[in-house]
């Protein structure tokens, strides 16, 4: 009987400690839940700030560096960022982890933003860009044509907000060369006003009638 009393007595404090420990665990669980909510809220705010930009990861490569102790591996990411309204940039990031490499690429792309001259949803005139052994040709297209491009070229054009265009890639099919050739072509575009001012002519003498109509429709002056 004393043994039973001792066991009962021992179980009494244990039973008392059980609810306390359960309460503590629940409290810890509540604290952890609150922490997750705060972190999720922070991520939600960042997502809202970044929602205005379109981000496309073109390619991710693993590279290695031979050192005295062996090999060190890292990752590189080629990223395109644009607002879908004529603003676009290209970035190349390198880090030990893929997410960090992508983030570095996004930051570099935002630093290299440039404006693409557009009329309605296409480019102003045919143009060709080159980078290393890559060559990309771009031609304006009528409304409803869509983006006739593939791979890296399409990523750049869609981030820039170009909806109707014809393209052809020649030479190297390396994604980095193709992307930089596309960017070189877009940077070579000129506005009709710039060409007219340089030649000393009027806008009607320089720009085709179809281009002027498309521009007027885009501006809403022609219904």
UniProtKB/Swiss-Prot annotation:
Where is there biased composition of kind Basic and acidic residues?
29-42
Would I find rRNA-binding among this entry's keywords?
yes
Q: Which GO terms describe its cellular component?
A: small ribosomal subunit
Alphabetical UniProt keywords: Ribonucleoprotein, Ribosomal protein, RNA-binding, rRNA-binding
One GO term of the biological process aspect: translation
Q: Which residues form the S5 DRBM domain?
A: 53-116
* UniProt key word Chaperone: no
Q: Where is this region: Disordered?
A: 1-48
Q: Which GO terms describe its molecular function?
A: rRNA binding; structural constituent of ribosome
**SUPFAM superfamilies in the cross-refs:** dsRNA-binding domain-like (SSF54768), Ribosomal protein S5 domain 2-like (SSF54211)
Tell me, in a sentence or two, what this protein's role is: With S4 and S12 plays an important role in translational accuracy.
User: Per the similarity annotation, which family is this?
Assistant: Belongs to the universal ribosomal protein uS5 family.
| Entry's free-text remark on domains | The N-terminal domain interacts with the head of the 30S subunit; the C-terminal domain interacts with the body and contacts protein S4. The interaction surface between S4 and S5 is involved in control of translational fidelity.
Q: How does it assemble?
A: Part of the 30S ribosomal subunit. Contacts proteins S4 and S8.
What is the protein name given in its UniProt record?
Answer: Small ribosomal subunit protein uS5
Naturally occurring in which organism (per UniProt): Rhodococcus erythropolis (strain PR4 / NBRC 100887)
Taxonomic placement = Bacteria, Bacillati, Actinomycetota, Actinomycetes, Mycobacteriales
């Amino acid at each position: 009987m004393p043994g039973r009393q001792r066991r009962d007595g021992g179980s009494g404090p244990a039973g008392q400690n059980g609810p306390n420990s359960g309460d503590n665990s629940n409290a810890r669980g509540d604290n952890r839940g609150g922490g997750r909510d705060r972190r999720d809220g922070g991520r939600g705010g960042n997502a809202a700030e970044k929602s205005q930009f379109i981000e496309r990861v073109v390619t991710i490569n693993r590279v290695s560096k031979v050192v005295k102790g062996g090999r060190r591996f890292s990752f590189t990411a080629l990223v395109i960022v644009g607002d879908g309204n004529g603003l676009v940039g290209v970035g190349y990031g390198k880090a030990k982890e893929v997410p960090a490499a992508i983030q570095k690429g996004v930051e570099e792309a935002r630093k290299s933003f440039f404006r693409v001259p557009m009329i309605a949803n296409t480019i102003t005139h045919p143009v060709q860009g080159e980078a290393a052994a890559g060559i990309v040709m771009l031609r304006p297209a009528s409304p409803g044509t869509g983006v006739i491009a593939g791979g890296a070229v399409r990523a750049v054009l869609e981030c820039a907000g170009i909806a109707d265009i014809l393209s052809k890639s020649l030479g190297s099919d390396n994604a980095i060369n193709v992307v930089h050739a596309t960017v070189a072509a877009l940077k070579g575009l000129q506005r009709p006003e710039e060409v007219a001012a340089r030649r000393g002519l009027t806008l009607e003498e320089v720009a085709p009638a179809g281009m002027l109509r498309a521009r007027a429709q885009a501006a809403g002056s022609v219904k």
